[in-house]
Amino acid sequence: LMDGKIRLNAAAFWQEWDDFQFSRLDTSISPITLTYNVGNAESNGFEFDFTAMLAANWSLSGAASFVDSNLTSDYARNGVDVDAASGTALPRVPETKWNLSTRYGFGDDFFLQAAYMYTGDSYNTLFDGGTISTQRRTQKAYTVVNTAVGMERENWSAQVYVNNLTDERGSVWINAVTWDQRVTINQPRSVGVSFTRSF
């Protein structure tokens, strides 16, 4: 597009599962994770990515995905009482994810870059297990900002970076087992230097 200044890719998808499987750790049954057949499910969505050259030394890129995934049949562990009804959202699948990044070069070799990444809400498990530690909980949306400044030559590059600039603490996963519930968070703010050389 625009004489090669913009590149755009997009895709839509629709997927149906028969005998969808779900992994869950329940220490009242087994000390290891078990896989359950939970019926039928579907996942529909749309995703795209783009890169745009705003100037000879300035680029902008991004990507996004929008997913609707849920059960299409009721699930009952004991065959009678429904634990997850048809229409229940599948776990660990954010409905929305997107990112935006930019890179600006100046002088002959120097560059600045920044990236903004958003992960939407998701659920930690398929159904509520009946105890505090096995509750179905929402893993809240969070954002991460990464920045860097560096130098790039023909066969090497070096940069100083700050990942997770705002020190955002997002819940990557909240477990749902029969002992204490624990939350795994994303990596906190980190500052570093990297060097790359091509041979």
What kind of region is each of these model predictions?
Residues 11, 132-139, 145-148, 156, ...:
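Short, glycine/charged-rich beta-strand-loop motifs at protein surfaces that mediate ligand recognition
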